[in-house]
Amino acid sequence: MVKGTNAEQALAREEASSSRPKRQRVPSIVEEEGENGGGDVVVRSGTLFELDLLDCPICCNALTIPIFQCDKGHIACSSCCTNVSNKCPYCSLAIGNYRSRIMERVVEAFIVRCPIVAGEASSSRQKRLRVPSIDEENGENGGRDVVVPSGTLSQLDLLDCPVCSKALKISIFQQSLFLAKRQNGCTETFSYGNELVHEKKCSFALCYCPAPNCNYAGVYKDLYSHYAANHKKLWTRFSCGYSMHVCMDFESKSLVLQQYSDGPLVVLQCFKEPPQGLFWTVNCIAPSAPGVGKFSYELSYSTAGNTLTFRSSEMNRIQKVSFQTPEKDFMFIPEYILCPMGLYKGTYICIRSLEEEEEEEEDNED
C-alpha cells in the first residue's frame, strides 16, 4: 500500500532535490489495488491555479483546438473567430489565419479532474484544495480548504525556452525561422506558427500529380515536367486565347490540359449529381504565389438550342485535385438539358493568360 498522500510524497521529493526534474513514483494498476508495482520515472509537472487562463477570452468557454492568434498575440477559439468576422476585438487586427501552436500544446497537456467533490457537485472544473498557511509549513496545524479551478500541466517543458531550455519569463517573443529548405528552395522567413499560411503562397510549395494512381509531388515546375514526361497520353494541349472543344464524357470525370511541353496544368472536372445535374470546375495546379498559374477562362455548353456560359476573371489555383462536389466557383448544367450521349458535343473552353493581358494593357497605355 502506498504510504502518504500524493501531495506529501511530492513535498518530500521537492525537499530532497533542488533540480527542476522531479523523480516521482508512478503507480501501476496493481499498486493502486494494494500490491507493490510501478516504477520510478522522471516526470515534470506543475499545477495551474487559474484554470480560466485556458478559457477563450471572448466566449469564456474552455479553449479547444484549433486556437488562433492575431499578430499582437491575442487568442480566440475557432468559433469566436467566425463570430467576430476574423477581426480581433482587442486590437482590430485579423485573427483566424494563424494558429497558436504553443497554446494548443499547453491545452492538450493539461489534465483536470472530475468536478464532483466528496459526492457533491461543484461548479465546472473546480475542485477543493488544501492551501497551507505559514504556520502549517512550520509544523503547526493550519491552512484552509478553498475551492479553486485548477489543473495539472503534465509536460512542464512546454514552458521552457526552446533555444536555451530555461524556464520562460516575461517578456516572451515569437520566433522567426526559415522554411525547411529544399534544394535551391525558399529562404523567406516568417513568424513561428505561420508555416501553413506561408506554404499556400510559397512558390516552392508541393503540388501533387493529377494522374490517377500517381503519387508524385514536387514544386510546380518539376510537376509540369513530370507530367509531360510520364503521362503524355492523358493530357490535351491548350493555347491561351483560343477556344477549344472539350472531349470528355460523364464517366471520365476529369481532363488535364497542358499549355505546352513542361507548361502549366489545368484540370477540368465534372461531378454528376442526379437528379440535380452536372457541376463543372476548372482549376490550375499551382501554388498561390505571385505570377504563377494566373489564368482567366470561359466555359460554355450548348445543346438543343440552349447555351450556358460561365466566365471566371481568375482561375482557382490548387495544389492537389479534390474529388468532392464543389460548393463554389462552378458551372451548373441542369439535368433536363444534358445531352444523353455525354459531353462530346457542345462543350468549349477558352483560357487566357492574365499576365499577357496585363502586359498588353501596359503597352496600350504607353
Swiss-Prot record:
Gene3D superfamilies: Zinc/RING finger domain, C3HC4 (zinc finger)
Region of interest: SBD: 106-354
Record bears the keyword Zinc: yes
Positions contributing to Zn(2+) 2 binding: C209, C214, H226, H231
Keywords assigned by UniProt, alphabetized: Metal-binding, Transferase, Ubl conjugation pathway, Zinc, Zinc-finger
Spans annotated as Disordered: 1-37
Pfam families from the UniProt entry: Sina_RING, Sina_ZnF
Record GO terms (molecular function): transferase activity; zinc ion binding
GO biological process: protein ubiquitination
Zinc finger (RING-type): 56-92
Enzyme Commission code: 2.3.2.27
Protein purpose: E3 ubiquitin-protein ligase that mediates ubiquitination and subsequent proteasomal degradation of target proteins. E3 ubiquitin ligases accept ubiquitin from an E2 ubiquitin-conjugating enzyme in the form of a thioester and then directly transfers the ubiquitin to targeted substrates. It probably triggers the ubiquitin-mediated degradation of different substrates.
Description of its domains: The RING-type zinc finger domain is essential for ubiquitin ligase activity. The SBD domain (substrate-binding domain) mediates the homodimerization and the interaction with substrate proteins. It is related to the TRAF family.
Protein name from the UniProt record: E3 ubiquitin-protein ligase SINA-like 1
Protein source organism: Arabidopsis thaliana (Mouse-ear cress)
